[in-house]
Amino acid sequence: MRVLRSRRIQNGAALEALLITPGGPGYRLKEMELDIVSLSRLQFAITALYHFLFVPLTLGLSVLLAIMETVYVMTGRLIWRQMTKFWGTLFGINFVMGVATGIVMEFQFGMNWSYYSHYVGDIFGAPLAIEGLMAFFLEATFVGLFFFGWDRLSKVGHLMATYAVAAGSNFSALWILIANGWMQNPVGSAFNPETMRMEITDFFAVLMNPVAQAKFVHTVSAGYVTASIFVLGVSAWYLLKGRSVELAKRSLTIAASFGLAASLSVVVLGDESGYLANEHQKMKIAAIEAMWETEPAPASFTVFGFPDQAARETHFAVHIPWVMGLIGTRSLTTPIQGINDLVQSAENHIRNGIVAYDALQKIRAAGDTNAVPQEVKDVFADNSQWMGYALLLKRYVDDPRQATDAQITQAANDTVPGVLPLFWAFRIMVGIGFFLILLTGTFFVLSARRKLDRYPFLLRIAVFAIPLPWIAAEMGWIVAEFGRQPWVIEGILPTAVGVSNLGASTVLLTILGFVAIYTVLFIIEMGLMIRAIKAGPEPDSKPEAILAPASIAPAE
């Protein structure tokens, strides 16, 4: 059977084996799920979470470097050049580690998720290809000019190189999140029963997908916050030690100002993401809120509680009236559907999906499109959007058309993701976000009053706050990706269908290998970062440009 499956993959018919052939494939889905599916998900989660330790800092530091160097070019003050070089060194260390950990991410689609790659490769691969050709090469080309062009380029020329690095970093995030946003809201595409694949029908719709755009601005804003808190904390450490005081004060001022603006934007853009999720991923919102029953509008927000998924209730729940209704619907009259109602809707979708599945079998059996009765085509067209729900039954039965009512109910219940981890991951993320607004706001006020070094206890808080934006970012990733389960493509392709036919021992071995390698890389990153921070900024002997008469005091 392994040889047969391999030949089907080579012939480009992997999905046909899953959608058409009764017998073996269904059996393997049921038997493999606990090992291959879970292990493949675990491997992707581990590598993604490791990679995302480096991405936010790269996004944010690239912009902060552009700001600092712009001030240097405009004022000619040597300390701003020194700041740009120092923080640029830390950016370079992080950038290299981000590239090293990111390469594996794309290979996994072919290694562990070959069915997924075959099914949607034409759509998902396009943004990733553009990212590599446009954004990554832009970033990789100009990052060399940033580090080695200080004495070879003019001020403005080097500044343009720095801007190009920042643009490349953010363009990379844009294209990757366009691909991810399509997985969350698969617009501009349709299933072709002749090729058994998803195909692009409107690339502009994929590009302008509102979910993708909201994810992009929310994610890059989170990266700006991460870099701001990093610069804030390191600068606070310098002030506590009495080292590089002038550089630290200016860096802290930039970080507090930029961080406050970014923190506020994260909240606003996160609200937009929540609103769009309630439109396109209602189950995710219901699970985040542990909303078991549909509440009368406007729904309340559960601040605290212990969700019990088995009993479908939340113990010791503390609610704030109206808040969730305003966030999720932006109205006082529109209800937010609860988990139980959504499960019932999923059961109806599964039954409609079975109708589409049956029509697809007839279309494929006819061989020639012209030989397919029009009424069969119409039935498939009317119900094809639900065919992914029929594939949820592959866990329990070889042929979804043979599913019992109990199996359909069980598959409908599978559409509920893990409520407890989602509930708390979201609240940890939000709690940290509001704390960082308070922290950056406090230092913004202290900076305006020129009292940055007056309160050592606040500086210590800033130092200890350095890990917080990373924790919030990882929690956000969990909310976005774990909340999409059981779908690898929302409503289209279940996660259990997307995996490759690998042995569990093979996947487990690669997990252990990746964990070992990534842990070593993380330790190297931390060691290099700490060494560079302890060494401090290098003295810059280049004469400072004279842009104003000596009688005019330059701005701090």
Model regions and ranges:
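Membrane-interfacial loop-to-helix junctions in multi-pass inner-membrane proteins
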Residues: 75-93, 119-125, 129, 149-167, ...
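Aromatic-rich transmembrane-lumenal/periplasmic boundary elements in polytopic membrane proteins
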Residues: 175, 179, 259-365
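Hydrophobic alpha-helical membrane-insertion segments
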Residues: 92-101, 163-186, 259-270, 463-480
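Individual transmembrane alpha-helix segments
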Residues: 45, 210-223, 311-432, 511
